[in-house]
Amino acid sequence: MRLNTLSPAEGSKKAGKRLGRGIGSGLGKTGGRGHKGQKSRSGGGVRRGFEGGQMPLYRRLPKFGFTSRKAAITAEIRLSDLAKVEGGVVDLNTLKAANIIGIQIEFAKVILAGEVTTPVTVRGLRVTKGARAAIEAAGGKIEE
């Protein structure tokens, strides 16, 4: 065993820094912050995205677009999800009961993704052309 081969015990944790506990600790007086300047002050430091006074990137670039509020309450339903609904009738309430869509959803559209094997009746939902053809080919029907 030599001094250069010593290491802490497995799973041990290094003690945290104790600031301002005298000059001999190495972290007294200025507490590791150096002398003066913005970063030495309480609450000192610059905000995220600050570029030293230069016009920051997020302000140099133009604004564009918006976030649709309707998108948060709209869902897409795959054809393969229709089989998870019990009873053969698919509408917003049965989709919510089967945990396919969230309770906040107000609009839904069935899309051609996956496949439908059992005949189902889709009621009160929008349906794409491809999904409509697949549902009718499986013996199901769409009611507006």
UniProtKB/Swiss-Prot annotation:
rRNA processing keyword on record: no
Record keywords, A-Z: Ribonucleoprotein, Ribosomal protein, RNA-binding, rRNA-binding
Entry superkingdom: Bacteria
Amino acid composition bias (Gly residues), ranges on this chain: 21-31
Coiled-coil region list: none
One annotated GO molecular function: rRNA binding
Region (Disordered): 1-54
Gene Ontology BP, a term: cytoplasmic translation
Family note: Belongs to the universal ribosomal protein uL15 family.
Quaternary data: Part of the 50S ribosomal subunit. Contacts the 5S rRNA.
Protein name per Swiss-Prot or TrEMBL: Large ribosomal subunit protein uL15
Source organism of the structure: Escherichia coli (strain K12)
Gene: rplO
